[in-house]
C-alpha cells in the first residue's frame, strides 16, 4: 500500500489539487505496479509563514 505525502504551500485551487492526486496516483501505479485502489495520496498545505528558504519565510519574501 503506497502512501504518498505531498507538502506544498497553500494557494492551489481545488481543481489543481484534484489533478495532483490523479497524476501522482497514475505515476505510482505505472512505476511500481501497485494496485490503484491501494495507492493513498495525502496533501498537506502549509501556510507561507510556516515555511522558510535560506532563512526567510515565504510570506516575508513576497
Curated annotation (Swiss-Prot):
The keyword Isomerase applies. Its EC number is 5.3.2.-. Keywords: Isomerase. CDD domains: 4Oxalocrotonate_Tautomerase. Gene3D superfamilies: Macrophage Migration Inhibitory Factor. The active site is at 2 (proton acceptor). InterPro entries: 4-OT, 4-OT-like_dom, Tautomerase/MIF_sf. One of its GO terms (molecular function) is isomerase activity. It comes from the Bacteria. NCBIfam families: PRK02220.1, taut. Belongs to the 4-oxalocrotonate tautomerase family. This is Probable tautomerase SH1546. It comes from Staphylococcus haemolyticus (strain JCSC1435).
Amino acid at each position: 500500500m503506497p502512501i504518498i505525502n505531498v507538502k506544498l504551500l497553500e494557494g492551489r485551487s481545488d481543481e489543481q489539487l484534484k489533478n495532483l492526486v490523479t497524476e501522482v496516483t497514475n505515476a505510482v501505479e505505472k512505476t511500481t505496479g501497485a494496485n490503484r485502489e491501494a495507492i493513498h495520496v495525502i496533501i498537506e498545505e502549509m501556510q507561507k509563514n510556516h515555511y522558510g528558504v535560506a532563512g526567510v519565510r515565504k510570506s516575508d519574501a513576497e
